[in-house]
Amino acid sequence: MCIRDSSQTTSDLGSLLVGFSGSWLAGCIFWGWLRAHPVLHLPVEAFAVPVALGGLQGRWRLAATFYLSSLVGTACTDLAMAATGVMQFWPAVVTASLDQAPLLLHQAGTHLLQPLPLITLVISAVLVLLAGRRLSRNSGGFTGDVGSMAAAVLITTLWVDGLFLLSALLQPGLSGLIE
């Protein structure tokens, strides 16, 4: 019995690694070559959607769910950036000189503290939290721990985005966005 549990755990970890690798590869491609073009972010990140959709019914279910959950988180972030008006800062920040980029990133962060963008940001965060909670509770049509894992991936997006915003406000040079 322990051998099967250990084997299943190893299989699950391998599957999660495959899903993470798909997300990581897409991010590397975008941030490495196309980062100045925010309109390309989601299409590049979605390169493996056909493979992931096919994997939902087979042994790669965890990998596919991880990748798709990460993609949904990315879509939520991009939508919130567009809705708050901060997307307009993106090309300037990532193409600015090293001495100008932190100032531009800080300006983008402070833009989010204005009333309308802040309300939009809070509503967006609440919607993501509610979606994550729903996935976690009833597994959103998933079986076993897959729904909980999808919820964790989605909610982790909020943590990462929140830390990035905090960094942009307090110490823009440490955000990881500026080379």
Model-derived segments and their meaning:
Residues 103-126:
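Hydrophobic alpha-helical transmembrane segments
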Residues 1-6:
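Conserved small/polar residues in nucleotide/adenosyl-binding loops
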Residues 9-22, 38-48, 64-72, 151:
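Cytoplasmic-side transmembrane-helix entry/capping segments in multi-pass membrane proteins
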Residues 30-40, 60:
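Membrane-interface helix caps and helix-loop-helix hairpins in membrane proteins
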Residues 62, 66-92:
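Transmembrane alpha-helix/helix-exit interface in multi-pass inner-membrane proteins
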Residues 89-107:
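Membrane-interface interhelical connector segments
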Residues 133-157:
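Interfacial loop-to-transmembrane junctions
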Residues 162-179:
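Juxtamembrane boundary at the C-terminal end of a transmembrane helix
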